[in-house]
Amino acid sequence: MTNNTPEWNNWPDGFIWGSATAAAQVEGAAWEDGKEDSVWDAFARMQGNILNGDTPETAVDHYHRMPADVALMKELGLDSYRFSTSWARVRPGGRSTNTKGLDFYSRLVDELLEAGILPWLTLYHWDLPQALEEAGGWANRDTAHRFVDYANDVYSALGDRVQHWTTFNEPFCSSLLGYASGVHAPGRQEPRAAVAAVHHQHLAHGLAVNELRARGAQQLGITLNLSNSIPRDASDPVDQEAARLFDSLQNRIFLDPILRGSYPEDTLQDLEPFGLGDVIREGDLEVISAPIDFLGVNHYHDDMISGHPDSSGGDGHSGGSGRQPASPWIGAEHITFPSRGLPRTAMDWEVNPDGLRKLLVRMGEEYAALPPLYVTENGAAYEDTVQADGSVPDGERTQYILDHIAAVGRAVEAGADVRGYFVWSLLDNFEWSWGYSRRFGIVHVDYSTQKRTVKDSGLAYSRHIAASRPAASGTVPARSVAPAV
């Protein structure tokens, strides 16, 4: 059978099917049990930063509804749940340990294991303690060392039960969107600080990998959001150069230090005016390139790039707020993102499933030291509503997910070493500067009652997981609703 649909079933032994969330987007309980402000709590309080003035204060109340949410994961048949721990909950001021915060994650891990679900832990999904931001944030090299203290706390509490440890999720966002464009927390628009943040997050990653490896961790990795960079006109030198710049800032500035132990030469030259060379110290790149056991790939869409003015495809860096963002493309602020006329999600992102196949195959072709890959986020935002019969029809999201799963299968057929797929997201949640206006979940959340209702996409994903197992057993319920509690 050729892999034109997800019914293709030659998945590698042990292939993991999961779903993902992030602490700041789902937990709520913003100041409960010792937690203090993260940069996102502080950012959301500033008028105009978040669409509709939304905040993550309550989110989807996962902090209080966690056991029911884990039961829902079990009902869906997930192999794994990818979640993040909140630095602002574990070390509220960035420097002292909060045992109540760690206790929550210990209970979560125990619930997952009891349900037969593999915990997949991310240490940093953008919620830096506000106190550390006030000390300079990621532009301050000391923050990398404070991250190791935090990682050690989490490992001490959970290392006996958690196998998979991801240091960072999408450092592109927490550095370039947070410190250059300002559309993400902490909302700074300082290119030199953004470049320093990139390097210091790399350094924090490497320091944590070495520290946790020494303590016995066996599966250590990082998750990067990666995209194909496609020149609008491959014969046009202006478009070729724009595509090179985009690839440098979106992909290679993150991949190369980790996998090759060096920044790309063109990136060093491009960012020399913004201080990249100034923040690199002797020995840093040896630390940063510490071997990893897996690489998480987050991918939602790829991008056509031009060096000519073109507003047909958006600006490539806006968020949901009315705040005027700067460009995250430091030194390449002129690049544009022409539309290809493809269908678009509610995020205004083009839908091109084959882009994921191309990306996964390209990774293996370009990086000799590439570890096994996991697609750690892939999903789509669309408008959806609970119907009178209790259903949540979301055919566009369902098709998006199944088409991208098929693309992963084609990449595996082509030789890509991909070992898992996590749909984003398990639950509708706080979508950063878009607030609650964009829904990615395969489970609908009524934000007024916190009632969970599995969408058609969740049911389809559950059926796919069951069909993909060598010896499928049991049936997927026709409809599943988790009540408000």
Show where each model-derived region lies.
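A common structural microfeature
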Residues: 14-16, 60-63, 80
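Active-site mouth loops of central-metabolism enzymes
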Residues: 51-65, 138-141
